[in-house]
């Protein structure tokens, strides 16, 4: 789960990390009132969407008068903001953050992220803040410093000091930078985040350290422990199909291809998508129905997939363990009838009650393309796409 910048800054503020004063706004009038309340003389008008690169896309602007705040708010609110993270379709801006301007002397990059190789948290810092960390990693990788944190000790003063020194924080500001780094690590752990990113963390002219951006990603599986974070959820920023799928406990992620995939098990789902790519096409989605799928759940999965106009073929790939093949077959038959299926359907089933499942499909009278192996299923789905 992602949240907006202003929400992330509220979490940082509560954790004791210095952030600029800011007020969210949903209308131009609210933006003007926010600027008046903050007092100026310089404000930052920032688009709030769940994507990075807003500045380059024209979603972050400086204003030096209330009239300019009003003008910029009117331009940014409602715009379709395109960044390197949104894709060419962009995202509609429905919220703004009106914030005090900052006296920026130096910009740094700071993040806490799950490092799967070490199975620990990695604190990542760079002296090149304010720009895409991916660009820094590509152009000057030596400017990215990583410190792996032992969960038994947390980020120690020695480690935080090492990081602050490595990115050139002046001696007079080192103690505050160390404090901020330790608090970023702590808030990462306390909120069950998968990413906390401050880009940039700045050094002001008076020597103070401040976080002027905040990006949080949270582990969905831990949200039951954090109702206060769930309250930040903005469904307008999420894929409608993914929101709909979550209502039925379906693990669904939209992709750019044209073969809809319905699979049980995340590993098999990823292998299915890889096999589709191997044979020259692309999956339209990741969809794991899990081990407890019912015919009703399969029907909803079909409905969600078919809402995507790019889907030209559906591929069902089931390994029956906990999930029985006859249950999936009954669900597929019910789904085909419920949605009046008008695209080719390829089905491959192996495992528990396999023969019964195949018998149900064969006797259904539906034009189902049967496959024996995953490779066979993928090849038949790709052939159907090319013939469409």
Curated annotation (Swiss-Prot):
Top-level lineage group: Bacteria
Keyword ATP-binding part of the UniProt annotation: yes
GO biological process, any: succinyl-CoA metabolic process
Gene Ontology MF terms in the entry: ATP binding; magnesium ion binding; succinate-CoA ligase (ADP-forming) activity; succinate-CoA ligase (GDP-forming) activity
Binding residue positions for substrate: 264, 321-323
Binding residue positions for ATP: 46, 53-55, 99, 102, 107
Pathway named in the protein's UniProt entry: Carbohydrate metabolism; tricarboxylic acid cycle; succinate from succinyl-CoA (ligase route): step 1/1
Cofactor annotation remark: Binds 1 Mg(2+) ion per subunit.
EC number: 6.2.1.5
InterPro entries: ATP-grasp (IPR011761), ATP-grasp_succ-CoA_synth-type (IPR013650), ATP_grasp_subdomain_1 (IPR013815), Succ-CoA_synthase_bsu_CS (IPR017866), SUCC_ACL_C (IPR005811), Succ_CoA_ligase-like_bsu (IPR005809), Succinyl-CoA_synth-like (IPR016102)
Cofactor(s) needed by this chain: Mg(2+)
Residue span(s) of domain ATP-grasp: 9-244
One Pfam assignment: ATP-grasp_2
PROSITE patterns the record matches: ATP_GRASP, SUCCINYL_COA_LIG_3
A GO cellular component annotation in the UniProt record: succinate-CoA ligase complex
Keywords: ATP-binding, Ligase, Magnesium, Metal-binding, Nucleotide-binding, Tricarboxylic acid cycle
Reaction catalysis annotation: succinate + ATP + CoA = succinyl-CoA + ADP + phosphate; GTP + succinate + CoA = succinyl-CoA + GDP + phosphate
Family: Belongs to the succinate/malate CoA ligase beta subunit family.
Function statement: Succinyl-CoA synthetase functions in the citric acid cycle (TCA), coupling the hydrolysis of succinyl-CoA to the synthesis of either ATP or GTP and thus represents the only step of substrate-level phosphorylation in the TCA. The beta subunit provides nucleotide specificity of the enzyme and binds the substrate succinate, while the binding sites for coenzyme A and phosphate are found in the alpha subunit.
The protein, known as: Succinate--CoA ligase [ADP-forming] subunit beta
Organism listed in the record: Albidiferax ferrireducens (strain ATCC BAA-621 / DSM 15236 / T118) (Rhodoferax ferrireducens)
